[in-house]
Amino acid sequence: PNENDGEELVRTLDFVEARPLITSLGIVPLGFTRHQDTFTESFNEPARAQAVIDAVRPYQLRNRKATGRTRYQLADEFYLMARTEPPCAEEYDGYPQYYDGIGMVRSFLDEAADLLADEEALGPIRAAAQRLEMAGERVLLVSGCASAHVVCDFVSALPVGGRCEVVAVENDYFGGNVNVTGLLCACDVLAQLPQDLSHTVVWLPDIM
């Protein structure tokens, strides 16, 4: 914020637009922890995140029209913070920056939609929900705060009869604006899960 956004971001986008050999540009919001005092804000307000999306969009559209590729890729955090739908999978150009947090949400949404439309795949989920009900058990699914609403929407669409609940864990260890699932720490998960976990199955992210 106030460094490489606004007019400065536009200059960066213009610089890349004039250099076609740059095949993919990642635009990522500043992340900061509580263990410093230089930075105190980023793009966590919806309006500020949306402003970046709006600034980059014309460049994406022009490049797709000219070359069939997007090139200018916004980190998932911008769409999550603006509470807006990310672009379709095609616009991620094969997800070259997936592990930089660019396109993970779109990939998840598409996989979730495929699962929810597949009656055969939903069968085992219904069966598992019935077993949980018979045993008086529930599932707690751990998520970071940034993507918790996306995961909640998915879980609410599953035929699990209210047996699955999403727990959005605040990142107190790093603090600041760190809120992605991949940077969760065990100390925060343990501190924020219910003390009584009897008859409870806890599902942890595979990366944290």
Regions found by a protein language model. Give the residues of each.
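Conserved C-terminal portion of the radical SAM core fold
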Residues: P1-T38, A47-E77
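Flexible loop/turn segments at secondary-structure boundaries
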Residues: N2-N4, F32-Q36, L80-A82, A148-V150, ...
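Active-site-facing alpha/beta catalytic cores
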Residues: T67-D93
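Radical SAM enzyme core and accessory elements
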Residues: R83-M208
